[in-house]
Amino acid sequence: QYIFSPDKKFRTWRRLWIALAETEKELGLPITQEQIDELKAHKDEINFDVAKEREKLVRHDVMSHVYAYGVQCPTAKGIIHLGATSCYVGDNTDIIIMTEALKLVRKKLISVLDELAKFADKYKAQPTLAFTHFQPAQPTTVGKRATLWTMELKQDLDDLDYVLGSLRLLGSKGTAGTQASFLELFDGDHAKCRKVDQMIAEKMGFDGCYPVSGQ
């Protein structure tokens, strides 16, 4: 349940803001280590009350939480969400949460497969009646029947691994997916813009980002 909780969601937003600030600092923007440290010091202290009151005024969830984080981090407030758009925290967080949830399902699925394998081996010689077209057919064993369940779940595991292996972060591509805001921040340096996505992905534990997006 915690994986899908508001606390998990907004803590992940803050982790993404820290990753963005670190990346921008490493690529030469005037961001100080003091600002990074301040962000890290408050990353798990979500001030929901401040964000809620701010959202009543601005009607924007992301900007409300940028403001709330800035209240806790006055030195760093000017560099929170720098160059990014709402999808940077929204979509990336969805992908991170989906990945963590699927990994949890995978862990539980492997446990079920392990127990089924033991069950099938234990009852491999236990006779039972098999059916076809809902009619009694021929003898089989309980263990043999269990291997059918195991095979289907193994196929589910293969599908799950394929999905997990194909998931990437959105990255940070700006308002229209062109990274125009970053191109401006980096004074037209395309090489630095290209590095932004990969560096953020690595900081968040992903191999890379999707190459194109609308935002």
Predicted features and spans:
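Amphipathic, heptad-repeat alpha-helical segments used for oligomerization and assembly
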Residues: 206-215
